[in-house]
């Protein structure tokens, strides 16, 4: 069986080189075109889906919609869930990456961005831009909504969704598309493929490129490739 991952198209804050995380930003024109191209690739390669999973952030939802529209599958069920959100970048969200490196030093920012288990500084829950003040997450327990995450914590967040929804869908024979974010998809890929804590740091998923994971009947990893 095959599972398809797509990282959302290039966003407004990708273009501005800002830390995004759980902040909700839109796609750029480039991002829209990336999503259209991804949908056309899937159509040309004959990929059909029974269900699509995405996050509750606009850039991923729009990418999912565009991909499905371009591949003539906008009618299939979509499940939006916060567990597929991007990694939460804490107090760095909204900050310029270059300016942050100048303030804290390249090495410290590199550790925050690329180490597996070191989180950036927490975002104050009282901050107007905190997810605690976003009605998308109003029904979640306060201790579930993050103030900052590293990739290890992100994996711990996405894993229950894999086990409860994505894996059962695959095992039931459904053809699955997951349209999400760089780090939530990297976390899932780490679990599925069996990538080590060290190797995952160099594992990147480009925006708008369909990544196909081939799995056996027990969901063991076989191979991966981009369309």
Curated annotation (Swiss-Prot):
InterPro entries linked: His_Pase_superF_clade-1 (IPR013078), His_PPase_superfam (IPR029033), Phosphogly_mut1 (IPR005952)
EC number: 5.4.2.11
GO MF, one annotated term: phosphoglycerate mutase activity
Family annotation (Pfam families): His_Phos_1
Entry annotated with the keyword DNA damage: no
Swiss-Prot/TrEMBL keywords: Gluconeogenesis, Glycolysis, Isomerase
Annotated site location: Transition state stabilizer: 181
Gene3D superfamilies: Phosphoglycerate mutase-like
Pathway recorded for this protein: Carbohydrate degradation; glycolysis; pyruvate from D-glyceraldehyde 3-phosphate: step 3/5
Protein name: 2,3-bisphosphoglycerate-dependent phosphoglycerate mutase
Organism: Histophilus somni (strain 2336)
